[in-house]
Amino acid sequence: MQRLWAPVTLRRVLLLRSVYLPHSWAMQEPRLAVLSPRYFSCTNAIRAKEAHKTSTEEQEEVPLNPPQSLAGTEGLYKADSEPVPHNKGDIDPLQDKSIGIFQRFKKTFKQYGKVMVPVHIVTSTVWFGSFYYAAMKGVNLVPFLEFIGLPDWIVGILRDSQGGYALTAYAMYKLATPARYTVTMGGTSLSVQYLRKHGYLSTPPPVKEFLQDKMEETRELLTEKMEETKERFSEKMEETKELLSERMEETKERFSETKDKFSEKLQETKDKMSFRKKAD
């Protein structure tokens, strides 16, 4: 209440002083009264409170950004409502735009090699024939190679070569590799769609399921091989055991025969010795 009524009280005091004091002093006093510390204490407190409230609202509206010291961890500060990206292994290489053309070309060759090889042969033949025709019409590739800044020894090979149109066509063929791969990928995609539409090519399962099926097949094959190996080993063990038992029986029989013969010989020797003693 004192802070709210302080300006009014000061104005009354100034009016009373203006009546009793000279006019010049009364004109200067309001400035001092207006700049009194109590008046500014009230307004400054209100302004500071409003400024703090405004800064708090601005901080709430500013989106959460990662600090500079944690560069590369932007994913930790994003909202949890973002869709979970699909596994790259499940994406068809013909539809995967997140990788380069050369990686897509390799993956497509691994998955659709039977379709891609004929398409690539046809497109490469068309490309090389077009470049050979352009070379016959007088297209000179040397200024372009010098313009893009290739080494002099490479440019010199093409300039001083006796290969003629074929070498020029081959150089243009190699320079157009990204475009050739792109055309091959497009032709392969159209061919795959056509073959699937007419039932000549089945839709491949996702890579995860494909790998799981392959793992199951491999596991079954390994189990069968292990069972066959166990059976063979057990059969071999039985055969070996039978052979050993037969050998042992034969050895016992031979040993018994040898023992009988030895006992007979010993008995004969004893009889002869006893007969000689009696004769003496």
UniProtKB/Swiss-Prot annotation:
Domain DUF1279: 96-208
Organism, as annotated: Danio rerio (Zebrafish)
Membrane topology: Single-pass membrane protein
Pfam families per the UniProt record, alphabetical: FAM210A-B_dom
Alphabetized UniProt keyword annotations: Coiled coil, Membrane, Transmembrane, Transmembrane helix
Primary location class: membrane
Location in the cell: Membrane
Stretch list, region Disordered: 245-280
Superkingdom: Eukaryota
Coiled-coil spans in chain: 207-274
Transmembrane segments: 115-135
GO terms for cellular component: membrane; mitochondrion
The protein's name: Uncharacterized protein C18orf19 homolog B
